[in-house]
Each structure stands twice: as structure tokens, then as C-alpha cells.
Amino acid sequence: MLKLNHKVKKRKKALETINELVNNASHLLLIHYSCESFYNVPSGYTPRVTSIAVRYYNTAQTKSFAIHKVAETQKIPFEDIEQNYDELEREMLKEFFQFVKKHKSYNWIHWNMRDLNYGFEAIENRYKVLGGRPNIIEDDKKYDLARLLIDIYGVGYFGHPRLEKLIEKNNISNRDFLDGQTEATAFANKEYVKLHMSTLKKVDVFHSILDKVASGSLKTNAKWYEPYGLSPQGVFEAIKDHWLYAVVMLVLGTILGKVI
């Protein structure tokens, strides 16, 4: 019973969170970034950042921070990016954290950006390594879309890789999208533009997924009972959350109102 109540409460809270975020669309951002492979750096070192994309939810305008763009601005030839990487990365992260400073009151939606390997802390630490002083986004402003989906639909709503399967199931365009392994290969091959295009695509995908969750139209492989369980209370909660329940209750209320 306690486990069921916990699952139901987590689902309800996650749905409320999504609705609150979408209702405050003017202060909602979606973020993703690409970086060096975790497995190709010396033990304990933070991976180099290649590009960051931040999208305004209410306008779909996207702000880009990319290593190749900084190189272009500084008139550094593409083939010389590698030997100037630290300086270019520092400038890119400086621009990003200037943006953060102006948007600290905003809510930030991300996908699994949770720790020092891959996350806000990793970007902050990388900037510190390069001699910068990052502006910190408070934890209560960060919302992990990956975790919210698990809370809403259950851990089995898709197997790994969940993001790719969500894209396929919901007929979302995957043009320019690279999976983790392909991104690692792209970094090794110095394909920075390809990496950035993938980063831009992923914030676009997050936007589509968030819209579908908010409208109740996201398709998953979750069975109707999985977020609740198969106990009598779980079945009741599942039925109660279905749109038909609201229709039936409205009709019954109308009939009873006329009778009474």
C-alpha cells in the first residue's frame, strides 16, 4: 500500500510539475550540450565541452554556444581548433555563463544532466579548470525530463535507449540526431559542426516531448496500469486519471442534478 501510494504521489507530482513549467512558458528553457567522450579522458578529468544549446520554450528561439563558432569569430582556421581548444572553450563557456547570469530566475529542463560526469556541475567544473568563475543555476531551477517521464509512465515505459525509442514511437524527426557512441566518434574525428547540429536537434526533441506530455498525447510502451500497479486502489487511480472518467462523472453529475 505504501509503495502504491508513493508511485501515485510521484506521478501526480510529476504531472503537476510539467503543467506548472508549461504554464510559466515565458521563463522556461530547454538545455543540452555535447562533449568529449567520458571514456576517452584521463581518469578523474572533466570532459571537454564542444557545444551548448539553450531553447526558449515559448518562442522556440535557440541560443547556441559552440567551439567552431568561437573559432570563426576569432578567425582561427578550422584545422587549428584542436591546438587552440582550451582558449576557445574558455571563451565559449564565458559566453554561456554570461547567458546564465541573465537567466537565473528561469527554469531549466534537461535530459540526465545530473552529475560531474555529465551535467551542470560538469560544465561549471570545466570552466573552473580553464580559469573561469561560473554563475551557478540553483538546483530548484533544474528539471530532469528523463526522470519526470519515469515518474509519470513508470520505469518500463521504454527500454534503453529511451530517447531514441521515444522519437521513433512519436514520429518525431531524428534528422541530425546522434546517439552517444556516434557523438563520441564525431568528437574524435573533430566533427564539431555535426556535434552541434545534434545538440540543437536534441533541444528540439525535448520541446516536442514536453508538448506531448503536457497535452497527454505522448505515446509510450507502458501498459495502462504500470504507473499505478494492479491492486484495487491502483486500478481505481488509473481509471480516475483517464479522460473517460471525467466524462462519465460529468454526465452522472448532470443526470443527478436534474433528478434532485
Annotate each PLM feature.
Residues K201-A238:
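Juxtamembrane amphipathic/hinge helix adjacent to a transmembrane helix
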Residues T50, Q61-I67, Q74, Y106-H196, ...:
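Metal-dependent phosphoesterase core characteristic of DEDDh/y 3'-5' exonuclease domains
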Residues A66, E79, D144-L145, D179, ...:
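Short, solvent-exposed coil/turn linker segments
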Residues L2-E121:
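Conserved non-catalytic scaffold segment of RNase H-like nuclease domains
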Residues P227-I260:
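C-terminal single-pass membrane-anchor helix
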Residues K101-K102, V129, S215, V259:
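Secondary-structure boundary motif
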Residues H6-N23, E89, Y192-T199, T220-Y228, ...:
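Charged, low-complexity, helix-prone segments enriched in Lys/Glu/Asp/Gln
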